[in-house]
């Protein structure tokens, strides 16, 4: 919308009314399917270890904590929701605030609304179908198409991301005029992400949503490794009209393997001069107690609303972006 006094909302009132209707529609979608809505904390004593995520940190000083207790604003409700799953809650969803101390712009705000849900006994593909159902209902769009990560690279960059070495990845980056970044980057996954962002994303999801699945095993995060091809993880992302909408996993249930991944993340953080993050022992204990076989997905609601309304920026669908907060 046009420039307004900063006390006023960035989004128009008609857009906020439409946003409210979409939130109601999302809740109805899950109620009709018997999925329980839950609420979990916005703060935790532990946080994500992913080298590409930057959480906000605060400090609690109160009874029993006179020396203070570090707390982190949640980048996603994932860890707490998995603890509920391990406790036997069944299928769950949540609409909540999440926080990331990163960029701000047309498609980013440090505080944003997340839709996250988990389906016991669903594999990755069944959950992808449910995500597709939700997108068609909210966006009135065509059914999505699906491409493996490998197929997407081969189609748009003519390179195999699962076998290419760093020299080949840098050569692909040079064709995109990205040598100034790629030539000094030693982390293979960062090179792959650079190529995906600049060489694949602009070409997918133009007319209909596109699922990209089977990311490299080195990018598994909290997903299982495929039993059919150990080079890839049971992980997917969804793109539509130039926007990343969602990220989903066939969830890892092995506590020991998850701890090893967290520790590996922290080693990568140390190598980059980033602070090592406290590992969530409660999550690991929940996995050890028995997380049911399940798949889960996190979807950016503000971006979904932006697409539904044909808006140009998140500022058009959020009442008060961070510069007006």
UniProtKB/Swiss-Prot annotation:
Enzyme Commission numbers on file: 6.3.2.-
Keyword Nucleotide-binding: yes
GO biological process: lysyl-tRNA aminoacylation
Keywords: ATP-binding, Ligase, Nucleotide-binding
GO cellular component: cytosol
Domain of life, source organism: Bacteria
Catalytic reaction annotation: D-beta-lysine + L-lysyl-[protein] + ATP = N(6)-((3R)-3,6-diaminohexanoyl)-L-lysyl-[protein] + AMP + diphosphate + H(+)
InterPro entries: Aa-tRNA-synt_II (IPR004364), aa-tRNA-synth_II (IPR006195), aa-tRNA-synth_II/BPL/LPL (IPR045864), EpmA (IPR004525), Lys-tRNA-synth_II_C (IPR018149)
Residues where substrate binds: 76-78, 118, 251
NAD is among the record's keywords: no
Single GO term (MF): lysine-tRNA ligase activity
Annotated binding of ATP, by residue: 100-102, 109, 244-245, 300
Gene3D superfamilies: Bira Bifunctional Protein, Domain 2
HAMAP family on file: EF_P_modif_A
Function in brief: With EpmB is involved in the beta-lysylation step of the post-translational modification of translation elongation factor P (EF-P) on 'Lys-34'. Catalyzes the ATP-dependent activation of (R)-beta-lysine produced by EpmB, forming a lysyl-adenylate, from which the beta-lysyl moiety is then transferred to the epsilon-amino group of EF-P 'Lys-34'.
Subunit and interaction comment: Homodimer.
Family to which the UniProt record says this protein belongs: Belongs to the class-II aminoacyl-tRNA synthetase family. EpmA subfamily.
Protein name: Elongation factor P--(R)-beta-lysine ligase
Species: Salmonella paratyphi A (strain AKU_12601)
Biological classification of the source: Bacteria, Pseudomonadati, Pseudomonadota, Gammaproteobacteria, Enterobacterales
